[in-house]
């Protein structure tokens, strides 16, 4: 039988450089990715290096709260 609490949760990854710059004049928005993580394997906040179409480079995307 499956447990009532799901192990995999849906998370949102947001570009840290776009947020830090306060959406400067060069970028027109904030890049966000939707993915899943296993709560048992990675209990801490997830950070991945992904491509940001607003910064035009690979940046660190951190997990945010919904």
From Swiss-Prot:
<dbReference type="GO" id="GO:1990904">
    <property type="term" value="C:ribonucleoprotein complex"/>
</dbReference>
<keyword id="KW-0687">Ribonucleoprotein</keyword>
<dbReference type="GO" id="GO:0003735">
    <property type="term" value="F:structural constituent of ribosome"/>
</dbReference>
<keyword id="KW-0934">Plastid</keyword>
<dbReference type="InterPro" id="IPR001705">
    <property type="entry name" value="Ribosomal_bL33"/>
</dbReference>
<dbReference type="GO" id="GO:0009507">
    <property type="term" value="C:chloroplast"/>
</dbReference>
<dbReference type="InterPro" id="IPR011332">
    <property type="entry name" value="Ribosomal_zn-bd"/>
</dbReference>
<dbReference type="GO" id="GO:0006412">
    <property type="term" value="P:translation"/>
</dbReference>
<comment type="similarity">
    <text>Belongs to the bacterial ribosomal protein bL33 family.</text>
</comment>
<protein>
    <recommendedName>
        <fullName>Large ribosomal subunit protein bL33c</fullName>
    </recommendedName>
</protein>
<dbReference type="InterPro" id="IPR018264">
    <property type="entry name" value="Ribosomal_bL33_CS"/>
</dbReference>
<dbReference type="Pfam" id="PF00471">
    <property type="entry name" value="Ribosomal_L33"/>
</dbReference>
<keyword id="KW-0689">Ribosomal protein</keyword>
<dbReference type="InterPro" id="IPR038584">
    <property type="entry name" value="Ribosomal_bL33_sf"/>
</dbReference>
<keyword id="KW-0150">Chloroplast</keyword>
<dbReference type="GO" id="GO:0005840">
    <property type="term" value="C:ribosome"/>
</dbReference>
């Amino acid at each position: 039988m499956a447990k009532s609490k799901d192990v995999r949760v849906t998370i949102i990854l947001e570009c840290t450089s776009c947020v830090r710059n306060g959406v400067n004049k060069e970028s027109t928005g904030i890049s966000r990715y939707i993915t899943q993580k296993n709560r048992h394997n990675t209990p801490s906040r997830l950070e991945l290096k992904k491509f940001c179409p607003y910064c035009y480079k690979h940046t660190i995307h951190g997990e945010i709260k919904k």
